[in-house]
Amino acid sequence: EDCRRQRQMCIRDRCQGYSEPGSGSDLASLKTKAEDKGDHFVVNGQKVWTSYADDCDMIFTLVRTGPQEPKHDGISFLLIDMDQPGVTTKPIKLISGKSPFCETFFDNAVVPKENLVSELNKGWDVAKRLLQHERNMIAGMGLGGAGSAKKKKDQAITSGMATMAKTYAGEEDGKLANSSLRQKIASFDINSHAFSLTMRRASEESKSSNSGPSPASSMFKYYGSESNKLRYELMLEAMGTKALGWEGEGFGPAELAITREWLRTKANSIEGGTSEVQLNIIAKRVLDLPQ
């Protein structure tokens, strides 16, 4: 019954309460605590970089319930109603001008015991699994796919980089005039196609074995993040001075959108686990290298 009810809660608009000030890459050091009060928990603490928390009505949250346990073993996974006294959010304005992230504060927020997912102090196992799914989603940004949450009107630009580059840099004999940029875009397209096929193969193998995401998701997340940053670097190189706009006349809406999205991509190698963390996971769990 609890599983059925929790699934229904997760269908609602929800956000993810993982990172905290001082607990980002070392997520297991989180300080937000949930005290057992019999039939409910009382939660106090702060989360940060909570995507769209100001528009959500539920947050799934990592909290510390076993302060005397080893840090990975004293964490629980709670579903918390955002529309209650003691839960507040504050949007964070990014360099891109957007505010998709928020700070989320818990001040004696009450959470029923039935909102505990899995077992008490076993939330880290749930969180790791969800992070693998998130990393696969973020990896899709390297392909300009749905995982990047781009609007359809922007996808036409980001998926036709060579065509767009010709518009700004000109063409000779049907080819992009700038030979250096042409080689960079060709290399990017080849690598993107190979990456797409690799992700598809891994997905099919995962479905056939019913094993779900694996540590290989860190490989995809790392490559996808770096690839998406490169995608926008190449577009800005092609646009030249048209990439310098922020607002006002002389720049089209699509040009301004690309410039702002380029700024946003700098977070790709941080969110969902930094590129450095992914490399450590790859070394340890995929390549089995000695520490």
Predicted regions and their residues:
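A short, Trp-centered hydrophobic/proline-enriched beta-strand micro-motif
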Residues: 12-18
